[in-house]
């Protein structure tokens, strides 16, 4: 089988990681696997691919957004026509829409995977209007949470299947025996991830927890604003923003408490990674994902979304009680290992990939194809 995976970039994000896992898995099964990155300008990847997987960058072009998008759709269509895959699997809302447009009339099986919260992510009116229209032309919709499926209109729910992200990190973190409690967070430095809220929460308890530090790993457009916030609050000697790590092990070993401060999510990979390594974890109860991962207080602490005071109290409670940290960390690791084992998740993807083509062709041209 020839499979084409289409995604936005080739960086360190959650979608990139899942595509990498699936591409390596299907290639090992003997499939001819291609990865097309619509917004990448070079084929350099954060996650290593097997040599048998062909990775292409389709980015570049005009600085005018509408022309740039049109050019990428045209390049994508040319590659899909040339490759003539048995199946196309795309990731992320805008990429899904572009894949549907590029595939028109080619008679291809399409599986669209939503990786973010399409109700709250920043999209202009045209993208928001096109999303449900594009979804109607897919064979299957892969969602990550029950909340995401429940947000679909009835006509699309029948096409939806829930496949969570897998745990791939096999690492037992190094336990620190010192007196400093290290709080950490990881993600793109943008508004979605809510690091401004986390810094405010840290500032709220910094005076009563003098031996506590905060490290936020990642890069993004909010770096300058976050650095200014840290300076304004007088926390420059206790809050660090060291950038992106080369591997999860680097940040796993840099903390005792993990915090997910997002305003919204699709499904937080980083929370799974933290919990699987035994880090006591706290998360805002934002849509979507955290409440399905932290489904009981025994495995983690869930606080009302964007509630800075409650977040500060949760951090302070874990910082003051090493025994509780260790208990929650151990219980969380066992819970996510049982629910998000990689072989189980890969089997769910294999079931979707192996599904026969739907009886009704997706596009007019497909009705006459043989």
Give the ranges of each region predicted by the language model.
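N-terminal strand-loop element at the rim of the active site
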Residues: 5-13, 17-67, 153, 221
